[in-house]
Amino acid sequence: MEISGTSNRILEVNLTQRDVKEIQVHEKDRKMYLGAKGLGLKLLYDRLAPGIDPLGEDNYLAFMMGVFMGTGAPCSGRFAAVTKSPLTGIMLSSSCGGPFGMALKTAGFDGLLVTGRSENPVSLMIDDQGVNFEDASGIWGMDAEKAQETLQNDKTCGILIIGPAGENRVPIANIRSGDRFLGRGGMGAVMGSKNLKAIVAKGGAFTIVPKNPERFDKVKKKATAYMNRNSPTVEYRKFGTSSNVDWCNSGGIIPVNNFRGGSHEAAQKVSGKAMQKRYQTRHHTCKPCTILCGHKGTLADGSVHSVPEYETVGLLGPNLGIYDPDQIVEWNDLCGRMGMDTISTGAVLGWVMEAGEKGLLNTSLSFGSPEGVTEAISHMANGTGFGQEMARGTRWLSEKYGGREFAVQVKGLEMAAYDPRGSWGQGLSYAVANRGACHLSAYPTGLEVLFGLLNPYTTRAKPRFVYFFENLYAAINSLQTCQFTSYAYVLEPPIVKYTPKFMLGLTMQYLPAVAIMLMDVSIFSKLFSAVTGIRMNQWEMLKAGSRVHTLERLMNTREGIRRKDDTLPERFLKEGRSCDDAHHTVPLYEMLDDYYKLRGYDHQGIPSAGTLRKLGIEIKDPGVSFKGNEDFRFMVPRGKCVKRLYISVMLWFVGRAMQAAAKVDKGVKKEFEAIPKGFRFSLGVSPGGPAMVMEKTAAGRVKYVGSKPKGKPMDLQIKIKHLEGAILLFTFQESTAIAVARDRLVVEGDVPRACTVVRILDMVEVLLLPKIIAGLAVKRYPTWSPLRKHLGRCMVYVRAILGF
């Protein structure tokens, strides 16, 4: 039988009630969210209440096919999964190239939603007739590879399976399909929490035919030609994604010893070329695929194994000080059988090794030694011994034992194998990515390091390209196809391909919006239109990608995600790499505001009501109030001279307000009583920037002296390290306490008095600002009486303006 375009049928299974029903996808939702990831998020947005337990029976697990699946579109053998992560506590989306997607699609279904919890271990058997529930107690406890072999009795079958890590609800457990994985964020733990060992789909009952076959074939031919001549995709075909080792090592961004270094002379031993020669590799990849990046190889003992992907090589190799490819292959294979994410596993092992060096833990694990690693991985998967704690991730470990500054994670998800200190755009992308430190949300490091088109050590143009690639990749993961196709589709069209590299680079760096206009991503939208019959151009497709990305962010804000979470580990903000004489760090906060503006977020990183309306996203109690504040965001000064002038005026006014508050507010008076007479302190921008000088006179009065000390020595100087930090502070996007915690301030002189001054500044901000702003600017908003607040505010303003 044939399906023209797509079936638009989705199964919804409740394991608690053993109930199955069918959902129809409407054309409006198809056009707005495309499919796969986008539709999965929309379905969960309509069903998930904020704050649910990711491992509770109310969580949903969505497996979603895109419209390209089954059509023969290049690299279209991928599907998406969406749930709430037990590792991060926020939304989790993932992509996989295993055989399950094709099997479910050709069984006649575009997706599967699973909720509830089975009383006993169960497997789902799906064919064109529907769903059967089968007892899985016989395979419960088997590793993922063996259990999959037990169930695989037909070439038309596609299987999703968990290993011991998933059964034990380990927060970094993955789900396997063939030799591919839904790898990150603990999706396998969610499946295990439902006592669901496997899902088996028997396909082949249907074939998928595009609505416009002639147009489809024409676009497909063009897409294939682009990929066959694109240098990165050709490299991946020859050597796999571990060919990245060479350019990441030369670019100084490969993780070495828990991201302390960015390159190592021995890294070439684990490169794609070295492993191709060592293992005589052959293609073993997703179907259908034009790129053919997956490989298998034969070890010296004759055994055949999957050759590890770059991320696995980076995190289980140089990140641990290991340069033995056989060892990395062994650990990759073990993680695959146990059902555990190799990226998080490598990052956790790296953190434990460094924590041991620093005396935070007593461990035998150490950099450069494979001893104990195999046992540690097994303990993590089985939830035994210290492995039970390791499996909870680096964020949890560092909160318990210390060492947060070298816990290489964002929002709880461990970082992929690209050091952002050598790729500042990638640093911004990691910080703002919806699922955590993910390289698949946007990939500016390709332009910065692989192609050399953008200067990696500048903030210029980076927010624009992160925004563009986030929209593009959200669309790609909703259509769905492989993200590697974007290399070819973006850079192979003639207008880009034949522009001299230096001119293309200058355009990207200084006119990024123009450069993006030149990048032809219409192949994706043309394939979508040919398959579905729904007319769509590339700009509508990118808007759909923006809608998908923004919806995911909105769902995260319901779980409490805010600006404070869009950050990087201190290692990347304060420490240089051992391979970098210039000791570059990531100037993240210089890029964040521009990024928020492009996305239509407010100062706290919440999508504004206007943005949601523009994208057609319905507000379903997102956890914040938009009433009377629909598009509220601070006006941030732009341009260095304007910023200096703004800070000068603000310091002048705050100084006079502090002088006034010391006369009218009892709390401020009390704090100043602890400061001795004749004490002078200043708050200013370093080096040589605007400042305010305050003094408690011999008569006990608090006096604003001006912007310069006028000869008398200072007892205390509080210096803001740079102008951008001052802008964050004085546009009230960051409290003084947070600025101190983030090391934006330098204190010289009477350090104990600095705490008193910070408390006084907080009180003055409460007196000066309305609650909605002051609540962001101070560490803790006080419960003052209305009389004290409102009368005090009036008196402070009058005295500050008049200067008495």
Region locations from a protein language model:
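Short amphipathic alpha-helical segments
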Residues: 96, 143, 215, 219, ...
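Short, hydrophobic/aromatic alpha-helical segments in well-folded domains
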Residues: 99-100, 147, 186, 327-334, ...
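Feature captures hydrophobic
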Residues: 626-804
